[in-house]
Amino acid sequence: DENVFPMKHKKEWDGDKLFDSLYEALRTFLLANAIRDIRDVEKNTHRSMLINMSRFTKVQSVIMDIVQSHVDEVKRNVKQTHKFPKAYALTNPIIKDLKKTFDKQFSSFQYSLDGVTWDEVFAQLYDAISKIKIVVVNSGKNSSKLNYDDNKDGLRVIAVGGLALSRGLTLEGLMTSYFYRNTSTFDVLMQMGRWFGYREGYDDLCRIWLTKTSYSYYKYIYKSTEALTSDIRTMGLEKRNP
């Protein structure tokens, strides 16, 4: 429902809730952290989530506050229930939603060689998410700098931003991307496309939320890039110059 947060919103937007799909994306990122803690030998790795919904710095701060409130609520409920009997914990609506997200996004892992079950994830979840930070990254005075090098124990962060995230900024260990923006500008799309690269060792945990319009643009770019690559390869075989 675009009425919750219009695509063409104004800089004065000051709502108090966002899309259900964003909350689903947030739960996915939290769960992915727990899964990596279970699977990875190296625990001190950087893990990031990207949220790009507005070009207005004021609106980005509002979004950050909403995300902070939601994540704090999840942390609080996980802390209160993670030592309860599993069936009883699932009577908590927050935990029930986490289980639904796990079943939707990651349940197939239970049947893989390094299978991870819900019980394992829930037991690990609080430790995995307790140090996740939510920051806003933009040109404003309240912006945070993502100093990954200063966090030797691994920075776990949800970054909310706009243009700064679209052009040039690298998010280490990016696993979850939520992108509610439409742009048809080729170079901007290509720059943002690097978010979605192959992530060795955790590519199966990466998830992307896009609008249908953005998806169609990326599909077009993919086909164009593949055609160009094929043409260059053919010209090389024929000893021709581009």
Question: What residues fall within each predicted segment?
Answer:
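Catalytic or ion-translocation cores adjacent to nucleophile or general acid/base/metal-coordination motifs
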Residues: 1, 155, 170-242
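Short, well-ordered loop/turn elements at secondary-structure boundaries
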Residues: 25, 43-46, 128-131, 151-156, ...
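Conserved interdomain linker/interface between the two RecA-like ATPase lobes of SF2 helicase motors
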Residues: 1-66
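Catalytic micro-motifs at enzyme active sites that drive phosphoryl/nucleotidyl and oxygen chemistry
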Residues: 38, 147-148, 164-166, 195-196
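Short His-Asn-centered micro-motif
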Residues: 52-54, 137-138, 157-163, 179-182, ...
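Flexible loop/turn segments at secondary-structure boundaries
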Residues: 57-60, 141-146, 166-167, 184-188, ...
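Generic, well-ordered alpha-helical scaffold segments in large soluble proteins
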Residues: 25-32, 36, 66-77, 101, ...
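Conserved C-terminal RecA-like helicase domain
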Residues: 42-158
